[in-house]
Each structure stands twice: as structure tokens, then as C-alpha cells.
Amino acid sequence: MESSELGQCADGFVAWLGRLGYSPRTCEAQVALLRHLGHWLADRGLPLSSLTSEVAGEYAAARRGRAQLRSERALRPVLSYLRELGAVPSAAVVVPREPVDVLLARFGGWLSRERGLAPATVSSYLHQARPFADACAGQFGTLTAVRVAGLATEGAAGLRPRSAQVRANAVRALLRFAWLEGMTAVPLAEFVGSFAAPAGPAIPKGLSPAQAAEFLVFVRSAPGGLRNEPMMALLLRLALRAGEAAGLLLDDIAWRQGVITVRGKRNRVDQVPLPADVGGPLARYLRDGRPAGTAHRQVFLALDAPHAPVTHAAVTSVAGRALRDAGISGNGAAHLLRHTAACGVLAGGGGLAEAGELLRHDGPQVTAVYARSDLAALRSIARPWPEEGGPR
């Protein structure tokens, strides 16, 4: 296909856009952009096969004086369609070339494969470990205990205690990987110092039963409520994490059995009962709100075309915005809803083991912090303050 022939594929482009859920008005604007792009390439004597990401950037820059569709983002539907046709080069894949980049790419693969960490967690580890890897130029063979301790301390300078501890954890993981891969003569992870963090984890806080009910009513009536109500109910009632809600697949819902499959941290898979107050909103969304004709298997999709699957960050953003708009204050929006589910178990007379099962924790030591939030249970075992002259 020649660049001057781009306008001839308008009908196919419109059909493709329609399948992705774009409105007729957006389709019309995108077709105009497609035709204009063809003329722009032809005027410069450029074949369609030369439309790389760099050339697309030049075209976007040439449109900046226009009122609309003047950014590289606006070109994404056009480029995606032409790439599917094989008419233009695929998006360039960045291949690590620098030694540190190669090292971190291998480290990321190890974290995902051997440790079972989620992509977002792997990305965080790589970000936190990069300053250390850069400081030693990826040359781990010459590292000593003293050098490791010094670099770790320098890398934590200026960070808050909790942030410094997060970075230290990432560096330790990197050094364990280096030891297992034979890059260091001795294990060095233990020489990364610990950084004083606030005394004990914060007491988990959740919404009151009244707040939780009002929150879901608010979400249901707000824009996007058909999708957002079941999404928030999964966090609030079943204690799913944001990433777990985002990753939920259509095949994970067993309606007859009344359970869903939850894929959690470290590749853990659990079967979780699906109560009516979660299953009802979920069924309504799938019947009346989820875009039709999509090939995506994820349950929750973006409200706007092209209706891509929602991300961990999108679920967190929906939770934060809904809490704020509902006038409910609190930190860590998605986790606040998750904490609500666990606190509800304790308030209803359940024990820590039951709360840990709901939260899908790896062990009781992780759930132990919730004992501090169950004040009624703590009062029942607290000894009275000794009075003067009384028994001690």
C-alpha cells in the first residue's frame, strides 16, 4: 500500500474503530487524520513503510498548530490499525544494551519467575535497585562487604526511613540474585544495613459499616457506577488487592459454584466465595455495562475506547476518587477498603485466623497487626491497672 492510498482503507478503519467502541464522531475525526497523514507522507515522497515511531513524531509536531488531533497520542489508533495490516513497521522493542540494563533485565526476570512477584512489584524493585547497580557499574565480582554497606548507605541518603527500607530490600534481593548467579564470590545481601522505621506498622483502619454501605451507594450512582460498584465491592467485601481486581478474568468466575479464582502475590491462587452483594453488581456490569465485542478476557475494561483492561493504578485511582468525592478521608484508598473487610471480620466476632484467610495472607505473623485494631478483643484480655495498696 502506498502512502497516497491511505484514504482507500477508510472503510476498514471505521469498522475496526467501531469494534473497539469508538463513537461515530471519533471515527470521522480519525479517518480525516488517516487521510491527512497519507497526504503528508506523499508530499514528502515518503513510502508508507517509512512510518516509524520517529516519523510519526515528526508528523505530530507538524500538526501542533491545529485545533485537535495534534499529539502522538491521537495517532495511536491510526498506527495500531496500520501495524495490524502490516503496512507500517511494528513499534520498536527496546533491547537492553548497557551492562547495567542487561543485569536489571535478568534480575527482573528472576523476580518474576522465581519469586512470583507481580509486574508492578518487579518494576518497583528494578527502580529501587538501579542506583546501587549504577554505582557499582554492574561489576559485582569486585564487591566487598564494606563496599556494599557504603553504597547502600549512600543510596538511602535523604530518604525517609520507610522509603530507605524499601530500597534496602530491593538491593538485598539484587545481591541474592547476584550470588545465586555466581556474580559474587560470597553472599553479600546481609551487609546491606537496616534503616529505622516508625515503631511497628500502623494500626489498620477501615470504614464503619454505615460508611461502607454509603460508599457503595455513592459509587453505584456516580458516573461509571455499573463498572465501579462491583470493582469496589471486590475490595470492600472480599478484600481483594487493586492488582487482583484488575487481573480478574471472565474465566475466573464460576457462577454455578458461587466462587471466583483470585490470583494474588507470588503466584498464589485462591478460590473465594462470591456473595450475592458482590455477584449481583458484577452480573449487572457484565450484562449491561461491559463493552461488547471485545477480545479481552479481563473482567474490568476502561470506560472509554479502545476499552483496554484496567490496570492496578486505575483501580487505585477509582477507589481514591470515589472516597474523596464521597467525603470519606483516609490514606491508601484501595488498601483502606481491603482493611475494612478484615476489620469487619474481627468486629463480627471472627478471629485473626479467619481475617488472615479472607486477606489471603501467607502466615499468621502478617495478620497479627490486626490484633491492634480489634480493641474489644484486646480489652477482654487486658489486666486492670493496679491500684495503690492492691495486688500487683
Sequence positions of predicted segments:
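Conserved catalytic core of the tyrosine transesterase superfamily
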Residues: 1-392
